[in-house]
Amino acid sequence: MANIKSQQKRNRTNERARLRNKAVKSSLRTAVRAFREAAHAGDKAKAAELLASTNRKLDKAASKGVIHKNQAANKKSALAQALNKL
């Protein structure tokens, strides 16, 4: 446990951020998994719809600093390629 008051506050802030980041990353994984399942099933219409929502989530996570912007771009590119293969 920290003795310095500012570090105690940082610890509380970091814990809140960690929990928020964990929730965002979990929803990202769920969205990507749903898209991949639709793409694997060959449902192009549903996959296209899920791709749009997944891209929004990736962009939002990147803008909030949860993931790096290049990681978001790489995931979006890979998912778009998977959709185009259908």
UniProtKB/Swiss-Prot annotation:
Belongs to the bacterial ribosomal protein bS20 family. This is Small ribosomal subunit protein bS20. Keywords: Ribonucleoprotein, Ribosomal protein, RNA-binding, rRNA-binding. Residues 1-25 are annotated as: Disordered. PANTHER family: 30S RIBOSOMAL PROTEIN S20, SMALL RIBOSOMAL SUBUNIT PROTEIN BS20C. The lineage of its organism: Bacteria, Bacillati, Actinomycetota, Actinomycetes, Mycobacteriales. Was identified as a high-confidence drug target. GO terms for cellular component: cytosol; small ribosomal subunit. The keyword Ribonucleoprotein applies. InterPro entries: Ribosomal_bS20 (IPR002583), Ribosomal_bS20_sf (IPR036510).
